[in-house]
Regions:
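Residue-level signal for pocket-adjacent positions within structured domains
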Residues: 11, 61, 119, 180, ...
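Sec-dependent N-terminal signal peptides
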Residues: 3-15
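A generic structural signal for solvent-exposed, polar alpha-helical segments
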Residues: 9-10, 40, 44, 191, ...
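Acidic, Gly/Ser/Thr-rich repeat motifs that build Ca2+-stabilized beta-propeller blades
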Residues: 16-157, 208-227
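Beta-propeller domain segments
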Residues: 79-81, 153-227
Length: 227
């Protein structure tokens, strides 16, 4: 059974001196929105877990779907289309990919835009595939031209400490999916070169501190109160 949820987005505007704010409805009628990334002050890209990549004009309220051929699994539990980030005229999305034989992976695709649609969209990264149906992550962030992406440990726990697996890791890659030569473990032959951090469970939040130097992530831990 498919559930449609009407979600209302709000713009929150602050008056820091008077500590005043107001809520303004921007758009409604969305179906499980998961990630969004601003193009400019008036436009943004938004993903829905059901697989859509939408472009929303905050001024005209126009919602445009960007069709694609990515093998996004039917949304269930934590699976589906995940995060999106817009960078220099290109789109990067993370999603739960159907890898066949009931296996899935956290995958990242890069989309090129021409005439307000995708001229090409293709995978640049695929984590290992698994039958487990939990903990894909995933959030995306750019810093200094490099893409940071969080990958869940797929419910396998200790694999997050395994340097030969992408499960339970933060990766750092170039726009084409290759590993930067200065990644922390790139010189260690026993480690996957894309790995930036190990030991994560289900990281679903990431941000760059305002001073543009420190990265913060939110990692869902085993206990509900343990973040």
């Amino acid at each position: 059974m498919k559930f449609f949820t009407s979600i209302i987005f709000f713009l929150l505007t602050f008056n820091l001196n008077a500590s005043e704010y107001k809520l303004e409805k921007v758009i409604s009628g969305l179906n499980k929105p998961w990630g969004m990334s601003f193009i400019n002050d008036n436009e943004l890209f938004l993903t829905q877990k059901s697989g859509e990549i939408l472009k929303i004009d905050l001024t005209t309220k126009e919602v445009k779907n960007y069709p694609h051929n990515l093998k996004v699994v039917q949304p269930h539990w934590q699976a589906g289309m995940l995060d999106v980030i817009y960078e220099d005229g290109e789109i990067f999305v993370s999603y739960t990919e159907d890898r066949g034989d009931d296996k899935t992976s956290t995958s990242i695709a890069r989309g090129f835009i021409e005439n307000d649609s995708f001229s090409k969209i293709e995978n640049i990264f695929q984590s290992g595939s698994s039958w487990n149906n939990i903990h894909w992550g995933s959030r995306l962030m750019f810093k200094d031209g490099l893409l940071y992406a969080s990958i869940g440990e797929r419910g396998y726990g200790s694999v997050a400490q395994d340097p030969t697996s992408y499960f339970g890791k933060m990766i750092r890659i170039n726009k084409d999916g290759t590993a930067p030569k200065d990644n922390p473990y790139s010189m260690n032959e026993d480690w996957l070169p894309e790995i930036y951090q190990i030991g994560l469970r289900n990281p679903q939040g990431i941000m760059l501190y305002p001073n543009d130097s420190e990265i913060f992530i939110k990692n869902h831990r085993l206990l509900a109160r343990d973040l």
